[in-house]
Amino acid sequence: LKTGSDDILSVIGGRGLAVVRIPIPKKSFVLGSRPVLKLTPPETNDLSDPRVELFLAIAPDVMVGVGPLDQGEVIVDISDKNVRLTNESVCTQSSQITGRSKELIASLSPFVGRKVGKFPLPEAWDEPWFDRLRT
């Protein structure tokens, strides 16, 4: 961001912060060589669009991202299913991954390096808070 435009910093500053927690201790996020996950609708990838989301896992059980427009922080829990979708997406765009357990890495290894690029918003995303973030 140091070399980014003032517009990018302004957009991020106006979005607030979303903190996503995994409530089940058995589950965890992986980190990939391309760790930032950008979720976009098909017609745009502009971060000033409230439907575009950007997330980064910062701990095995915590992910942070841009929050709702003109709001402060939101802290939400994520479902097991969406932890898996998030991990698969990070793996797909990464050439290397690391995680908390051998079993987790083995289960995600088929997804590693399959595609680099933007990812559409998952159709199966079932978090009620996610819809609130986009409005």
Model-inferred region functions:
Residues 1-135:
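Alpha-helical structural context detector biased toward long hydrophobic helices
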